[in-house]
Amino acid sequence: MSSFSYEPYFSTSYKRRYVETPRVHISSVRSGYSTARSAYSSYSAPVSSSLSVRRSYSSSSGSLMPSLENLDLSQVAAISNDLKSIRTQEKAQLQDLNDRFASFIERVHELEQQNKVLEAELLVLRQKHSEPSRFRALYEQEIRDLRLAAEDATNEKQALQGEREGLEETLRNLQARYEEEVLSREDAEGRLMEARKGADEAALARAELEKRIDSLMDEIAFLKKVHEEEIAELQAQIQYAQISVEMDVSSKPDLSAALKDIRAQYEKLAAKNMQNAEEWFKSRFTVLTESAAKNTDAVRAAKDEVSESRRLLKAKTLEIEACRGMNEALEKQLQELEDKQNADISAMQDTINKLENELRSTKSEMARYLKEYQDLLNVKMALDIEIAAYRKLLEGEETRLSFTSVGSITSGYSQSSQVFGRSAYSGLQSSSYLMSARAFPAYYTSHVQEEQSEVEETIEATKAEEAKDEPPSEGEAEEEEKEKEEGEEEEGAEEEEAAKDESEDAKEEEGGEGEEEDTKESEEEEKKEESAGEEQAAKKKD
């Protein structure tokens, strides 16, 4: 009696992970199988191996038919006992697989919950991504207001500078006037000095004239005294002459008349000299008085002019001091305004830089979250593919069992196999276990690809906005080109793998067309059970 095992129906990774039971070898079947590929890389290996098992089993069943007819009842009983033990082991293995599959379903539910959480986080991130644009609009409005304020301050500064220039022009005019007044003051002081010098000279001349007048008065007094003495002498001479005349009356009778004539002549001469001296003195005194009056008027005018110049100089000095104080105050105010504007501009620039840094960090954080979400989607896709591979393994095992039940010819063996195939494994043919292995990964693959495309579009939109906000450097441009090339290479590799999988699926479909004709009835029953299971699952979900 030839022995057989279930080793060809499982992949190498599946056997290594889950199937650790003892093996029952079939030497006639082991040669038709090879090690299956990993469940993460491809999920078509179990189906191909199961198809090859079906072919080999169908070929071996033909050779076993004559031998089974010649078996006696003891051999049939031994075979049935072996089959019962094998089926017991298979039942235990399938229960273990059911438990593992239930754990995988729970894991899928957990991943779906995580997917919902990630979708909520993505929605929050998108909202945050929309919020920075709103903040950016607010900040741009604030920046525009600040720029308008800076322009107003600049205009005010220009107006103050114009006013300052006007004040500087006024100051220059006042300085020119001050210099002119200083020159006029110096001229007036020069004229005053000349007037003082003239006044001193006039005073000296007056003193000299007064001295001369005194000397002339003394001379006049002396001349009067001399004249009086001469008159006295003349009178004495006249008296002496009268006496001599009286003595010589008889000889000189005309002497008195001569003396009278002489006396009259001298009196006339003295009166004339006196008159001439008085006239000369009066004329000289008048001239000196007039010159002194003229000098006094000039001195008075010079004094008045000097006092007026001093008053004007004092007024202009006060005005210049006031202008200087005003200029210093305006310069101080202008400096304070410039310092304040510079401080405001620096504070605004710091605020702008801080907001730009926050926006940049928010964008980078959002890109990191999107990348993590994409990585989680990739992990989810890998887990979905692994689950689909395990589902295909289960379906291949069920089809193998159905072929085993069909291949047995004896009535007892066929009845037991039919009962075992319908009753013991009816729980495995529910909708959750008998979903189409070809449609399940295609659905999840398309769903995950749609999510990945959405994530990639979001990342590209984020990168485009960052590129609009900040011009990329040469290193960043090269990195983006490298990333694009890597993405294109990965897409090409994925397309090649998808094409290979499609070609393998097509080959499997072509090879399984002959066998599917034999199992149409079982497939129709499975479809009915699948529809019923789907309805139950939909009700559970609702």
Curated annotation (Swiss-Prot):
Which Pfam family, just one, is annotated for this protein? Filament
Which species? Answer: Rattus norvegicus
Q: Where is this region: Tail?
A: 398-542
Q: Where is this region: Tail, subdomain B (acidic)?
A: 445-542
User: Which Gene Ontology cellular component terms are annotated?
Assistant: axon; axon cytoplasm; cholinergic synapse; cytoplasm; cytosol; growth cone; intermediate filament; neurofilament
- List compositional bias (Basic and acidic residues) regions by residue number: 460-471, 528-542
Q: Where is this region: Linker 12?
A: 235-253
The record's listing under SMART domains reads: Filament
Q: State the Gene3D superfamilies in the record.
A: 1.20.5.170, Single helix bin, Vasodilator-stimulated phosphoprotein
Task: Identify this protein by name.
Answer: Neurofilament light polypeptide
- Residue segments, region Coil 2A: 254-272
Query: Which InterPro entries does its entry note?
Result: IF_conserved, IF_rod_dom, Intermed_filament_DNA-bd, Intermediate_filament
Q: Tell me which residues bear Phosphotyrosine.
A: Y43
PTM sites of type Phosphoserine = S56, S67, S103, S453, S473, S503, S522, S531
Kindly state which keywords UniProt assigns to this record, in alphabetical order.
Acetylation, Cell projection, Coiled coil, Cytoplasm, Cytoskeleton, Glycoprotein, Intermediate filament, Methylation, Phosphoprotein, Ubl conjugation
Per the record, the GO terms for biological process are: anterograde axonal transport; axonal transport of mitochondrion; axonogenesis; cerebral cortex development; hippocampus development; intermediate filament bundle assembly; intermediate filament organization; intermediate filament polymerization or depolymerization
Q: Where is this region: Coil 1B?
A: 139-234
Q: Where is this region: Epitope?
A: 382-392
Quick one: where's region Coil 2B?
282-397
